[in-house]
Amino acid sequence: MKRTPLRRTPMRKKPSRKPPMTSEVYETVMGRRGGRCEAHVATKCTGRAEHWHHRQLRSRGGEHTVENGLAVCHACHEHIHRFPLDSREAGYMVSSWGDPATQPVRIGGLMVILTPEGGYIAAGKKVA
């Protein structure tokens, strides 16, 4: 007995529940260090900000805010996701219960708090 093939229906993408990132937030983060990589963790760091990294991942409730974003190069972005424990210690990743606005992050050897205006406030902890 010959079977008739099932008709395939196209997959539909679920609509996003979160609003899209505004260009103002994107430009503020990407220009915060003059277009340079803020993490500078990998030995192959290109130094050029190519990716917008969410410190608190979107899958963990992270939003498109200036305090939650880092401008990083491709190599550093890969390193951050490949080594989450080290990244969390440096502040490049924030847990789902954490607050990126109050969690310090290592930028240029200093632990700083990211401000909504696109600046830094020293957290008082120098990192070697």
Model-derived regions: residue spans:
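A generic structural signal for short
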Residues: 14, 71-72
